[in-house]
Amino acid sequence: MEPSASCLPGFFMVCILLKITVLTQVMSLDIQINTQIPDTEEGVLVECTAESLFPPAEMTWRDSKGNIIPPSSTFDSQDRAGLLCLKSTILLKNRTEGPITCSIYNKTTNQEKRRSIILSDVLFRPQYMSLMSNNLLYLGIYLIFILFLNFLKGILFCLTKRLVHFRKRMIKIKKVWSNKTRACCPLIWEFLEIVLFIAFLPLYLMFRIRVFTLDEAHILYNNWLWKVCKTLIAMMILFTVLILFLLWTLNRYGKMPCLSSMNIDVSTHDAEQNSSKSAKFQENYDVAGQMILETYEETIFCQHQESCEEYNYDPLLLSSLDALGTCEDEKFSQHQESFEEDEDLQSFSDFKIELYSKLGNLTH
């Protein structure tokens, strides 16, 4: 009897300790508080959720002065183990001073656990509410615009690398535009994307959900985030200016990588066209030169023949053939001497230059 009697106090003590441990463990679970902007109503919807609570338990909302805030909706359920799951929401249409507290009170254990949040005044502005209600729409438009710019950039890159028709059009555009104007196009393209990426960060920090767990250092955290944002913006702007300056310097000295490949392709294409044109022009030039020389020789021969026919020879000569031969020799020598003179040579060179210029105009 003594051993059994001595075990009873220990058994009851263990049961009490287990019960207290379970109850304290249940009440020590975290309370989750979420906020969202409803699409239909104006205001901020605050939701408090707690799970695995030992029944019976109550959930109440209080402001900074301790006044009870009536909930907009409540929900409770039990799991297989008999533990409660509570969920309560309130709709705040006006800004509040100080924290808002969600408390859970257990009547059996006479324990209460609280969780407080601070809502920023920005959440109650109409501009913020309209923006946050369509936050996914604005984010989708932003991403679509970025993808569209990158898609256009890829199309232009493929066209400049493969299609000859696009190169011909680019050659015409380059003849109209100056070198500085051509350099500004890729710079503006890259600068636009950089500006969009830079502008997204402050917009996110300005219109994000500013809900802080009650903490003495939440103001310091907020200021620290804004300082980090300003530092990042300053660094991005500085590096953007440096990159644009380097691109402008490279383009000024004709060493810009983005335009060098295009210039090389265009120069090779122009060289091929010029070589084919020069070959055709050389062939036409040789043929026309031979024709001019033949016609010039024929005119000289005709002039000699006419001069020989007009020549009055002596009938006492042995034969007319000898007279014609001597006449031709004399006229040929005279003509050769006349070509040796400066005036005749100058006229012949002028005549030749004039014929070549006419030939060049005909070939073009």
UniProtKB/Swiss-Prot annotation:
Xref: Gene3D superfamilies: Immunoglobulins
One GO cellular component term noted in the UniProt record for this chain: membrane
Transmembrane feature ranges: 139-159, 187-207, 231-251
Keyword Cytoplasm attached: no
Disulfide bonds: C48-C102
Role: May act by engaging a cell surface molecule on immature T-cells in the embryonic thymus.
Extra remark: Encoded by one of the 11 copies of Skint genes clustered in the D1 region of the chromosome 4.
Name of the protein in question: Selection and upkeep of intraepithelial T-cells protein 11
The organism of origin for this protein: Mus musculus (Mouse)
